[in-house]
């Protein structure tokens, strides 16, 4: 199945009224169901031209999906590893789990403690450190 067919199938699943439309508030859920992981800021940017009560057709949704998909491709594993490597004090590819938790809950699009617990689960070693490359790959592939 190609991306557009997947997109149409998931879009139809979220069409609760049977009018071949989804609400603006559902856009993020549909994108996530399609394997995307947009930030709330990205979603807001994509739907900002629509009224909050608007219902989007599939034709309205496709450019949003394509935009988010393209943005995701721009961010590579290497870029995220490089960004986190600035916090690698020992130069051994590891970051302290407490410091990583602090970064994830205070910078950029802040994550909740529960989300961070889920992300970090199983990634820290016996010394309280996380392998940066392994962590980034696991997060990007989830």
Curated annotation (Swiss-Prot):
Molecular function terms, GO-annotated: calcium ion binding
Positions of the EF-hand domain: 2-37, 75-110
GO cellular component, as recorded: actin cytoskeleton; cytoplasm; myosin II complex
Top-level lineage group: Eukaryota
InterPro entries: CALM/Myosin/TropC-like, EF-hand-dom_pair, EF_hand_dom
Pfam families in the cross-refs: EF-hand_7
An annotated GO BP: mitotic cytokinesis
Keyword Signal attributed: no
Disruption phenotype annotation: Arrest at the 1-cell stage embryo due to a cytokinesis defect characterized by a failure to form a contractile ring.
Keywords: Cell cycle, Cell division, Cytoplasm, Cytoskeleton, Motor protein, Myosin, Repeat
Keyword Nucleotidyltransferase attributed: no
CDD domains reported in the protein's UniProt record: EFh
Coiled coil feature spans: none
Annotated localization: Cytoplasm; Cytoplasm, Cytoskeleton
Subunit annotation: Myosin is a hexamer of 2 heavy chains and 4 light chains (two regulatory light chains and two essential light chains).
Role played: Required for cytokinesis and embryo elongation. May regulate myosin II complex formation and/or the association of myosin with actin. May be involved in the organization of mlc-4 and nmy-2 into bundles.
Entry protein name: Myosin-2 essential light chain
Species the sequence originates in: Caenorhabditis elegans
